[in-house]
Amino acid sequence: MSDTASSGPSRFGFFLAPYHPLTGNPTLQLQRDLELVELADRLGYAEAWVGEHHSAGLEIIAAPEVFLAAAAQRTSRIRLGTGVNSLPYHQPLMLADRLCLLDHLTMGRTMMGVGPGQLATDAAMLGIDPVRQRDMMHESMAVLVRLLRGETVTAETDWYRLGEARLQLLPYQPGGMEMAVASTISPSGAVLAGRHGAGLLSLAASDPSGYEALVPNWKVYEKTLLEHGHTVDRSRWRLVAPMHLAETREQAMRDAEWGVGHLVDYIEKLSGRTAPWGQSPRDAVRQWVGEGFPAFGRATIGTPDDAIATIEKLTEQSGGFGTFLLLGLNVADWEATQRSARLFAEHVIPHFTGANRNRIASLEWADANSERMIGGLQAGIQSAFDKHGKTLAAALGADEEGR
């Protein structure tokens, strides 16, 4: 691993759906999610994003704002994002109100992530037509940004009505709350983000189709930003990919085998199909790092060097982005999950931030000038002896006489 400066993202964080096995204690699972955000804060990660889901059993955070309010009490620096609020599920004024409250409780550390909603089961329970979800997301965003700017809004659609609606509490952050729009393969998210000057949150960067869509979606985003008078800034682009690290690849594979079964079961039940590679944990992990899993893409399960290689590949493919987010999947046990977070912070983050570049340059300078420096040091010592030699000799002589 090199610690010299590298092109690539300069900020890192976690993206937590989160996914939890159906076995175990859900209360303790949520506590470990909070502990992971707390650990990320101590280790210097910049961001933590937390999702919103309402069905299928594994993704058990229904209100990311509530979870993040709890996380804010345990942390001091890390920024906290809703990853993401499913806009068709919420009356826009109520959602804006809750996020402004969270921004004040976190003293300006809140980020708002938005999307159409991922799980068909969530939409079905709410009586929402999946065909309408992206249109509903656009309709909600149109008034959300106005409310967050402090405007008074009167608007009506077939699913919400606002009459002279205004927020009584605006965001804590003077420049407004940072917003990001979820993007996978279709250009819908890129269009919405560009229209409103929000950041882009690419959730499927490690999926083969999502990987190929990175550049087309960026071009749509860039074009839409410019059409609406917004500044193009790659630092506001976030990419998400699953990773688990250990000291060796074999250890990382063994770690992932511990819990990969719950993801396989989840994929099979949501798709209604049996995965041929899901018969054993080892086969499942090999599939995941090879061709990848449906919806979850390809995982990097290996060493910090493997993580660096993956991020560099994403950088090359995308043309550059600002933040890399590790998708938290709870496939390893708690101790191994913490160790993975520490390895990433210790070795991967400094590689891209160049945290040690001046230390390395300082040692290289000392090496290149060592002969001159040592010569000068020796000359200085000799000069001191020449200058004070008589005094030293006299002191030694007096000491001998005293004996």
Regions inferred by a protein language model and the residue ranges of each:
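Glycine-rich, proline-tolerant flexible connector loops at the mouths of alpha/beta enzymes
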Residues: E47-A71, S86, Q118, A205-G210, ...
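An alpha-helical appendage that flanks or caps ligand/catalytic pockets
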Residues: S2-G8, V131-L167, G210-G322, I349-R403
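Conserved, mostly hydrophobic/aromatic
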Residues: A40, G44, E52, A71, ...
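Flexible, glycine-rich active-site loops centered on histidine and acidic residues
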Residues: S7-L28, P88-W159, G199-S202, S206-V215
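N-terminal beta1-alpha1-beta2 module of alpha/beta enzyme domains
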Residues: M1-L80, G175-M177, L363-W365, A393-R403
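Acidic (Asp/Glu)-rich catalytic clusters
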Residues: T4-S7, D41-R42, L68-R77, L99, ...
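Active-site mouth loops of central-metabolism enzymes
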Residues: L16-Q31, N85-L93, Q173-I185, H244-A246, ...
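Hydrophobic faces of well-ordered beta-strands that scaffold small-molecule active sites
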Residues: F12-L16, A48-V50, L80-T82, T110-V114, ...
